[in-house]
A protein has these predicted regions:
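N-terminal secretory signal peptides
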Residues: 1-16, 30-34, 38, 42
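Asp-box/WD-like beta-propeller blade repeats and closely related beta-sheet repeat scaffolds
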Residues: 155-225
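Short loop/turn segments immediately following beta-strands, especially the blade-tip
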Residues: 94-99, 146-152, 193-200, 250-256, ...
Length: 432
């Protein structure tokens, strides 16, 4: 059942005009919310230094614009109200065009910078802060930064409430005038208008999700975890870990409202976290955090309809011992390979549970074939990104940023020996 209602939230998390749509999402039982990432640390076995020179890759070498990487770091537990954040929450790095090595050029304070998104012009960077006590209230927050086109450095513009607790993900609409945010503990997807100068207005509308799932620890309520535009820019996929659903929304740019178009239910207890579309907009890949699988669906980008399930593949070998947990899913620029991250949460024993996992993509069907669990220099990877040329993969680990060479023929990853040691990295995004 859906109904529109005015919001009765506090001034801290809303604006004077707000549209609210509540969606029933069925199911569930159990006891309490979010599980914080453990501070697990484990020694990586030393391995011989491989030959990882860019010459091993067939990517042509040509003059390129300056390239930069942006990383966000954990500064405190996400739900620890009143904790003092660390000094540095975001770092900017230059990328060496020959070696892919990262050199820090700027560090800024930011409170638990969890995920990033560029506007379409890449002149602005938007950041969600995965917290639950913004300005003494009970919401997360969103920050806006201007990007210097020559130096890559950031200038803070402003910060707004995310309109819900524990902001987890965000996307900018193709026109660059709206920011869509998923609030993990807020049970909602929200919209913030973007001004001409890149700064953010307060939340103007939200979609609230009702429901739960069968996992008694992680699915007692809705947990929106991702918002991702399809390649045509017409529709937004919203993954909700708590209710085992992926919703498709259309953004009405005149009213700034999200309108539901379709939805699909994953396997009970799967916990959909993030999604990825193929370039043609005909396939939708969903990485499921709680059962460590990837599910592939047909997708119609003209109507925003999710079609039949084509494949479900495990990201870990069986038998598996320990807690299963996936995080990120990204398709390589070539369209030939897909990667996901497995996070080795506390108590895991199967080594492949802590890895960047590589697959080939069947160009006819979209189906995945597992080719590698890359475990060298990998420790609880929340996120990863490719450099702008698709030569390197940078993994956001609990102990720093590791650099891996991508074999352009096979998709296999090789650790380069470069590890930028940092506090726990939540996210990395590249530009250039």
């Amino acid at each position: 059942m859906t109904n529109n209602r005015p919001s009765n939230r506090s001034e801290n998390g809303t604006v004077d005009r707000r549209f609210v749509l509540r969606l029933a999402a069925g199911g569930g039982v159990a006891a309490a919310g979010i599980v914080a990432s453990s501070n697990l640390s484990r020694a990586q076995e030393a391995s011989p230094e491989p030959d990882v020179t860019p010459a091993a890759s067939p990517v042509p070498v040509e003059a390129v614009a300056p390239q930069f990487a942006y990383a966000g770091f954990a500064s405190r537990p996400a739900i620890e109200a009143g904790a003092d954040p660390a000094t540095t929450g975001i770092s900017v790095y230059s990328i060496d065009p020959d070696t892919g090595a990262l050199t820090e050029i700027q560090a800024l304070g930011s409170d638990n910078a969890f995920f990033f998104a560029f506007d379409p012009s890449e002149r602005f960077l938007y950041v969600v802060n995965v917290i639950a006590d913004y300005e003494g209230g009970d919401t997360g927050s969103v920050e806006a930064y201007a990007i210097d086109g020559d130096t890559g450095m950031l200038t803070f513009l402003n910060r707004q409430s995310s309109g819900g607790a524990v902001a987890a993900h965000l996307s900018v609409d193709p026109g660059g005038r709206h920011l869509v945010v998923a609030n993990y503990n807020g049970m909602n997807f929200v919209v913030l208008p973007i001004n001409e100068d890149g700064s953010l207005e307060p939340v103007i509308s939200e979609v609230v999700i009702d429901g739960s799932g069968p996992n008694p620890d992680r699915q007692t309520m809705s947990h929106p975890h991702a918002v991702t535009y399809d390649p045509a820019g017409n529709f937004i996929a919203g993954a909700d870990l708590g209710v085992d659903k992926v919703f498709i929304f259309r953004l009405n740019t005149e009213t700034s409202e999200l309108e539901q178009v379709s939805e699909v239910s994953t396997a009970p207890g799967a916990g959909p976290r993030h999604v990825a579309f193929n370039e043609e907009g005909t396939l939708l890949y969903v990485v499921n955090e709680l059962n460590a699988t990837i599910t592939l669906y047909a997708y119609d980008s003209a109507t925003g309809t999710i079609g039949e399930e084509i494949q479900t593949i495990s990201t870990v070998p069986e038998p598996y011992v320990g807690t299963k947990s996936t995080a990120e899913i990204v398709i390589h620029q070539s369209g030939n390979f897909l990667y996901n991250s497995n996070r080795g949460l506390e108590g895991f024993e199967t080594p492949e549970g802590d890895a960047i996992v590589a697959y080939t993509i069947d160009q006819e069907t979209g189906e995945l074939t597992l080719i590698q669990h890359q475990m060298d220099a990998i420790e609880m990877p929340e996120n990863f990104a490719f450099d702008p040329t698709g030569t390197w993969l940078y993994a956001a680990n609990a102990n720093g940023i590791s650099q891996h060479l991508i074999d352009q023929e096979t998709g296999m990853l090789t650790f380069t020996g470069n590890l930028v040691e940092t506090p726990k990295v939540f996210v990395i995004l590249t530009r250039g």
